[in-house]
């Protein structure tokens, strides 16, 4: 038991010799310091030769200084803006050369005219007279179409009475036509009344020609209808129904067949119609001047009718 106690004491002394005293942290506030109980250290017994010497601690390596930092690269200054070049002035517009005036056209009348001979002067006068006559005829023709129709009907009524025609107008209608005819004749100049009378006579002749053509066409249509009826009676009933459209074709042609007269004769007085023209002219000269109390030159009864003047229906 003693040996055991001795060994325990040796062990404790060895451990206490090695233990390093730890410094106690003192509190910041002195008021908070509390007294600590001091534990009495056990007296270390020194045993010769038993303490081991620890090797001296090597000093910590000193930290190597950091390499000196390289200075930052100096920022290069921005390039200074170059001054703008002075702007060149705009090029002045080139002055155009003055335009040359257009060459003036020389009027034709400035050219020296050749002297006109007497024959040429007469021809020009004749041409002017013909043109004036044509213009007068056209004007009178228009007057006839619009104004002298009542005179035509009045003279035509007298002609029908003289020839005992069935186309006789009523008394009231005849009086109205007389008034209208006289009003139109008074508006026509005296020098043109003879031409107006001739136009009235011409219109009457054209009207009679048209009536004759209509009568001829009606007679032809009646004859064709009679021939068709006779053919239908002679043919059997079976053939009639088959050939009936063919038999109707000539009847349609009847209304378009031209008369046997010369086509150029239509619209103008022909030489063979001069006796008829003279008869109607005398009747018009007896009726119209006395009825309307207008003056008509005496040469109007002897002049020849103008050919080629168209009348109205």
UniProtKB/Swiss-Prot annotation:
Residues 22-55, 102-122, 234-264 have a biased composition (Low complexity). It comes from the Eukaryota. The keyword Protein transport does not apply. Coiled coil: none annotated. Substrate of transglutaminase. Keywords: Allergen, Repeat, Seed storage protein, Signal, Storage protein. Residues 56-68, 78-101 have a biased composition (Pro residues). PANTHER family: ALPHA_BETA-GLIADIN MM1, PROLAMIN PPROL 14P. This is Alpha/beta-gliadin clone PW8142. It comes from Triticum aestivum.
């Amino acid at each position: 038991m003693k040996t055991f106690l001795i060994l325990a004491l040796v062990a404790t002394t060895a451990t206490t010799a090695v233990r390093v005293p730890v410094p106690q942290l003192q509190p910041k506030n002195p008021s908070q310091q509390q007294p600590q109980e001091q534990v009495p250290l056990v007296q270390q017994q020194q045993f010769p030769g038993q303490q081991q010497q620890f090797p001296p601690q090597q000093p910590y390596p000193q930290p190597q200084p950091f390499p000196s930092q390289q200075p930052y690269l100096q920022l290069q200054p921005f390039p200074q803006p170059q001054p703008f070049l002075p702007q060149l002035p705009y090029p002045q517009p080139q002055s155009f050369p003055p335009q040359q005036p257009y060459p003036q056209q020389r009027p034709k009348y400035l050219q020296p005219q050749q002297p006109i001979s007497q024959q040429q002067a007469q021809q020009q006068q004749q041409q002017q007279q013909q043109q004036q006559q044509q213009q007068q005829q056209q004007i009178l023709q228009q007057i006839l179409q619009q104004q002298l129709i009542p005179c035509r009907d009045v003279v035509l009524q007298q002609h029908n009475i003289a020839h005992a025609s069935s186309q006789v107008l009523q008394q009231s209608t005849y009086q109205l036509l007389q008034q209208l005819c006289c009003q139109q004749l008074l508006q026509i100049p005296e020098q043109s009344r003879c031409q107006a009378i001739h136009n009235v006579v011409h219109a009457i002749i054209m009207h009679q020609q048209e009536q004759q053509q209509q009568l001829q066409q009606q007679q032809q249509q009646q004859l064709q209808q009679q021939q068709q009826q006779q053919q239908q009676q002679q043919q059997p009933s079976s053939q009639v129904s088959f050939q009936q459209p063919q038999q109707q074709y000539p009847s349609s042609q009847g209304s378009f067949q031209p008369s046997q007269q010369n086509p150029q004769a239509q619209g103008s007085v022909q030489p063979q119609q001069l006796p008829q023209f003279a008869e109607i002219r005398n009747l018009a000269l007896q009726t119209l001047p006395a009825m309307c109390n207008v003056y008509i030159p005496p040469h109007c009864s002897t002049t020849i009718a103008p050919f080629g003047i168209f009348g109205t229906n």
